[in-house]
Amino acid sequence: VLAVLVWNFGSYTPGAQMTLKTGLIVQGNSSLEVQANTDKSWKVYHDPAYSPSIEYLQDVGCSDILNASLYPWGWENLDYNDTDWIEVRTIGRGQPYGIGSGYDWILCKRDIPFMEESLLRMNRIRRAEGIDLPSDFLKGKAELKVPANQKVSLFIDQDFLTTAYPELIVSGGKNSLVKFTYSEAMFKDGEKANRNEIEGRDVIGFVDKFYPDGGSNRLFRPLWFRTYRYIKLDIETKDEPLVLHDLYGMYTGYPFKENASFDCDLDFMKQIWETGW
């Protein structure tokens, strides 16, 4: 099965994303790959589970609000029933760059590598409010159970600024709210100070919201990666307890390898080189 998630922030599209309108074009370059071409053999479903979170809106787009009760869980699996999905509609054709005029999409050969993705464990919890934490939770070796009708806050420190997709796997907790707030530093009275200090400070930044549906092993992952050092996780449960099975990041970025070298007798010059990595 070939399953694709297609998204567009619409009026909240960030400056870094050049887009005409929502669509998907796939072209296979061999007799076998041609099966993947975007023709009427494809089916589509408009997912109503997502809505834009515009708290702390910046020029990097909006954040996500995901209502798990509306999400088509298992859509990417071979045994998923897509009977209610509809046939795609052609809205335009792609053309090679420099050929023709009046086109909507231009197909260009990719000349840079794809972005990498790898597991990035979150480093430590600097502060926890409303719950006692198992010591191995962030290592993926222990679950965290939040009782019904409870409010909990976790202040997570990656210890360095990174770009990653935070991923949270939960079960139960129908109608709960899980809120992610991302920041490079903590704030006090609207001001940043030493990035290592947290006492009397709070996290201000991009906000994702996830509303679990009570199902098992539900995965929340934002549509686009987040940039953060700190994550504040606010959880409010209703009539059901919420089990957090795991919380981690999936680091992403373009490959960046140190192919050159530098050496000299001045230590401060060596430190400048090291800072770049």
Where are these regions (language model features)?
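Extracellular/oxidizing-compartment recognition motifs
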Residues: 1-277
